[in-house]
Amino acid sequence: MSGFFITATDTEVGKTVVAGALAGVFRELGYNIGVYKPLQSGHVASNPEGDAARLKALSGVPTKEDEICPYSIEEPLAPRLAMKRAGRTVTLKDIIHHYNERLKEFNSLFVEGAGGLAVPYTEDALVIDFAKELQLPLIVVARPTLGTVNHTVLTIAYAKAHGLTVAGVILSGCKECEMERVQENKVMIEELSGVPVLGLLPFFEGEFTKKEVLESAKEYIMISKLEECIRNESTVAHTSSN
């Protein structure tokens, strides 16, 4: 299997935009990439304002929203609590089953978690437990400004302590007026974590188009580095299957 697990230092940091944009760029490059966000709270999957619909729109996948996100609920709470309050039970086994179903359509998947790695996810797992099952390299999406060094370094350390590989960090929501501080934060994150910051994605104000987001991803994210990871994963998977 190949792809990336997109996580973050917090909620509302920009995971969905990053995941959808990267998938869209890779699909334009000819890769058979799909997107998967097993659990979503705050919107049902079909809601155009929700993450599943935005993933579909940005990535350009033919997959239906309720297949991108098989478990969704309106209440904006941690997924485990939201499902419990709605009287629904979702287990780690359930979301892995749907992951394997998506792999029947695509060679690689970009998987988006919920919030950060320690978020209560299914009834029996945190987000990090799901990431450990998939063993995909992580992309950590983080805020660009004050507090991000601490949050990002802690997230990376937590991931590494659980045996996960962190491919890189993307700082999302960068404003031109803050770029001096953003660059300083980038350097500190790399020095303290040993993980590269692969992109400084701009802040998108108001309504934005798929074209704007994908063009920004191509300009501000090191797509070639991520492409190298995908190729290496595919080579390892092919070698292991022989």
From Swiss-Prot:
For substrate, which residues are the binding ones?
A: 41
Q: What is its EC number?
A: 6.3.3.3
Which of this chain's residues are annotated to bind Mg(2+)? Answer: 16, 51, 112
Pathway per the UniProt entry: Cofactor biosynthesis; biotin biosynthesis; biotin from 7,8-diaminononanoate: step 1/2
Which domain of life does this protein belong to?
Answer: Bacteria
Check the record and name the PANTHER family matching this protein: ATP-DEPENDENT DETHIOBIOTIN SYNTHETASE BIOD 2, DETHIOBIOTIN SYNTHETASE
Job of this protein: Catalyzes a mechanistically unusual reaction, the ATP-dependent insertion of CO2 between the N7 and N8 nitrogen atoms of 7,8-diaminopelargonic acid (DAPA, also called 7,8-diammoniononanoate) to form a ureido ring.
Subunit structure, as described in the record = Homodimer.
Put simply, this protein is called ATP-dependent dethiobiotin synthetase BioD
Give the organism, scientific name. Bacillus cereus (strain ZK / E33L)
Q: What is the lineage of its organism?
A: Bacteria, Bacillati, Bacillota, Bacilli, Bacillales
